[in-house]
Amino acid sequence: MTTGRAPTRTGPWPYAAWALTRAWLLACVFKVVTVAGPDVTVDVSVIYRSWYEVLLTGTYPLDDVTWQYPPGAALAVLSPALLPFWEYATAFFVLVLVCDALVLGLLLYAGRRPGMRAAGAWVWVVGVPLLGPTVYARYDLMVTAVAVAALLAGVRRPRALGVLTAFGALLKGWPVLLLVGVRKGLPTRAAWTSAALCAAGLAAAFALWMPGAFAFLAFQRDRGTEIESLGALVFHIARQFGWEGRVELRYGSMEFVGPRVELVSTLALGLAVLALGCCCGDCGPASSPCAPRPRRRSRRCCCSR
């Protein structure tokens, strides 16, 4: 956020708070500290590990309906191979920690620029541990690191924003929404063009790399309403008033099954498309992270040379 003042000196406090909170997260995922609820690390030690073994054979998980991710997700799942001296889950948690630290570094670096402040870094330091140990037991934080890098790069380089956004979208889809906020005009054309070209190139590379790069698209069609989705709020409330549905593990996620679930899923999908259309239509000059500064009007006479 631009404030028009000198950059704030943060001192050691963000680093200290980050170290303490991340030590707690690591203690949770390594089971030094017991947290109430299901064991979220199973997703890494069992599901991710099984995908890892399949990917090492030179193919995407063609027969596993729990594989619901774009082809770039293979890079995240295979990343623990960078640390072969540790077991899979340990290496994964350490790499997530590294990505967490990278985001903090990027936000603190951005906060040191003239006219900026470190509020974003503090939100990151405090907000991530509030998500609990689940945040270290998913590869979403790796995707977030790419998205944050894209936003910060886009302040001056919309093409860099486009390239990083395309890479992030092939990891887990949602970073493509960053393109919605780019200012109309030259920044939009630069960001969207670079994103399209990069996405096409990467998609082709993944398709040539291993068979089944886009098999996940067929696995998506039968998915229902996941319990953590916004549409599921209807059923969370309905259960308190006698709704006869239930929760089941289907297609790799906990979903609601029962009366009206298909209707709500269809409505949620339609509303999501409508919301995306509204965002694309309403993105304006004030919404851009890479909008050029307006030029000052010259005071000289319009006919002077």
Give the ranges of each region predicted by the language model:
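Transmembrane helices and adjacent periplasmic/lumenal helix-loop junctions
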Residues: 162-184, 305
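Aromatic/glycine/proline-enriched transmembrane-helix motif characteristic
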Residues: 92-93, 97, 235-305
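Perimembrane helix-loop-helix junctions
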Residues: 3-4, 176-210
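Transmembrane-helix signature of polytopic, membrane-embedded enzymes
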Residues: 107-128, 288-296
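Transmembrane alpha-helical segments of multi-pass membrane glycosylation machinery
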Residues: 92-108, 125-128, 144-147, 270-277
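TM-lumen/periplasm interface segments of multi-pass membrane proteins
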Residues: 2-117, 131, 220-228, 232, ...
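Short acidic/glycine- and proline-prone juxtamembrane loop motifs at membrane-interface regions
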Residues: 134-143
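Membrane-interface transmembrane helices that cradle and orient dolichyl/undecaprenyl
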Residues: 142, 148-160
